[in-house]
Amino acid sequence: MKLLMNWALPIALGVMPVAAAAAAVTPAERAAIVASATQAAARELKLDAARLRLMPEQLKRQSDWAFLTAKLQTPAGQRFDYAGTDRHEAAQAGAVSDLCAALLRREGAAWKLVDIAVGPTDVAWEAWATTHKAPA
């Protein structure tokens, strides 16, 4: 399953495939991308960003574009609890995942959020390459 999420699924969906000459991500870029996505996920959940940590599972960069999939966690590294968010009931019913997917674009030295899916139970990012004219 992890292989499917990390490689096969994004390739099949046209999001940052291996053949697209993905660039190496430096530790500083990784930190900036994850920080930007964390802030955006916290806004989406209407939470203080200090209550949330994203644990990257996949991070691909091509030119000025980055695609991140990460697990939602507490700052202590525990599974994220949607209590206190508008998704709590859905999470209790199993209708929300602990996944976050984000598409970002570099503008100058900053990574800016283009699109995000917090807690998707389907492939929410399927159309992002087309919708946002991102590399496929």
Where would I find each of the regions flagged by the language model?
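Bacterial N-terminal signal peptides that target proteins for export
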Residues: 1-11
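N-terminal signal peptide c-region/cleavage motif recognized by signal peptidases
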Residues: 16-21
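Short, non-transmembrane alpha-helical segments in secretory-pathway proteins
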Residues: 24-51
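Short Pro/Gly-enriched beta-strand edge/turn motifs at strand-loop
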Residues: 39-40, 81-88, 129-131
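Structured segments of extracytoplasmic/periplasmic soluble domains
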Residues: 40-44, 74-75, 107-110
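Mature extracytoplasmic domains of secretory-pathway proteins
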Residues: 53, 57-98, 105-106
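Short beta-strand edge/turn micro-motifs at domain boundaries
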Residues: 97-130
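Catalytic core of pol beta-like nucleotidyltransferases
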Residues: 134-135
